A protein has these predicted regions:
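A short helix->beta-strand "capping" segment at the edge of beta-propeller domains
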Residues: 30-52
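Surface loop/turn motifs at the tips and blade-to-blade linkers of beta-strand repeat domains
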Residues: 46-51, 88-90, 94-99, 142-151, ...
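Beta-strand-rich domains and repeat architectures in extracellular enzymes and scaffolds
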Residues: 46-71, 102-105
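Short coil/turn segments that connect the beta-strands within blades of beta-propeller domains
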Residues: 62-63, 110-111, 161-163, 208-210, ...
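Short loop/turn segments immediately following the C-termini of beta-strands
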Residues: 70, 118-120, 168-172, 216-218, ...
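Structural motif
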Residues: 72-77, 122-130, 173-180, 219-225, ...
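Blade-loop segments of beta-propeller domains
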Residues: 82-118
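Conserved blade-ending motifs and adjacent loop-strand segments that build the rim/top face
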Residues: 232-252
Length: 280
């Protein structure tokens, strides 16, 4: 994104921030009314166009956040608001010709952003897209076997210790983890049966060797999955009223505390919350 585009984006964002003040109050009020069951410890409310650009996946390189919408990628400071860079047409024409129209969950690994790409409602091309984390430029893609990945690719996650990429066999009712090697052109490595199905995973990240998965189930729960034996344990319920649970990541704050950061679309879908949750 050029300097002119950055300045223009910031100017538009500032103007819209003023315009959307009433909506910010409204959505914040709705969230406050239902906050008795919430388990977050802090939150950022993003209203209007900004919410659209933060409506699917998220990840971090440890210093900045990355967010996806169905067709865009943006990079922000860890306040989740200040845009550093953006690609508002992040699906290349080559993939659009295959029907790809949806960017899902993201995962940062070794200078790249790995993204689940889908031809939604068709499910012929489950694709892992690779983007340069510094520039957001599209770099490469890998088409997975649609007979193995049977209902799209709403999320992917790379284990930073092994370079293995994880996903599931089904977007709604998965029965196993599927593992691919990023160092060998996404060669299939193995499958790991889950102890029970984790429904509607929207995004996942590794922390201390455990795979954490954020879902859009009834309580928008976050689960912990052992990547060795597939044992599943619920970590917490987000207990959100309506809306939609989205992606997640981890960030270490200036005080040294590591927190789980998860995103959700608000009840009336004109805002997005980026919330912090305890890791332990």
């Amino acid at each position: 994104m050029s300097m002119f585009q950055i300045i223009l984006t910031k100017l538009i964002s500032t103007v819209l921030a003023v315009v959307f003040i009433p909506f910010s109050v409204l959505t914040g009020g709705i969230d406050l009314v239902t906050s008795g069951g919430h388990t977050d410890t802090a939150k950022t409310n993003i209203v209007g166009l900004g919410a659209i650009f933060r409506s699917q996946g998220m990840t971090t390189d440890g210093e900045t956040f990355y967010f996806s919408s169905k067709t865009t990628l943006i990079r922000t400071k860890t306040d989740a608001k200040t845009v550093i860079d953006a690609d508002y047409s992040a699906i290349p024409d080559e993939l659009k010709e295959l029907g790809i129209a949806h960017i899902g969950g993201l995962s940062y690994y070794d200078g790249y952003i790995y993204a689940g790409l889908e031809d939604s409602k068709v499910w012929d091309y489950p694709i892992v897209g690779v983007y340069d984390a510094e520039t957001l430029d599209f770099v490469d893609y890998y088409i997975l076997d649609c007979e193995t990945v049977t209902r799209g690719l709403p999320w992917v996650c790379v284990d930073p210790e092994t370079g293995y990429l994880y996903c599931t066999d089904h977007s709604k009712k998965p029965t196993k983890l599927l593992v691919y090697d990023t160092a060998s052109e996404m060669e299939f490595v193995k499958e790991i049966p889950l102890s029970f199905s984790v429904p509607s995973i929207q995004g996942a990240e590794f922390h201390n060797g455990t795979l954490y998965a954020a879902t859009n189930d009834e309580t928008k729960a976050i689960y912990k999955i052992n990547p060795v034996n597939g044992e599943v344990e619920k970590h917490l319920d987000r207990n959100l009223l309506g809306g939609e649970g989205e992606g997640m990541t981890f960030i270490t704050k200036e005080n040294g505390e590591t927190v789980l950061v998860a995103m959700d679309m608000g009840t009336i879908f004109i805002n997005a919350f980026v919330r912090e949750y305890p890791v332990n």
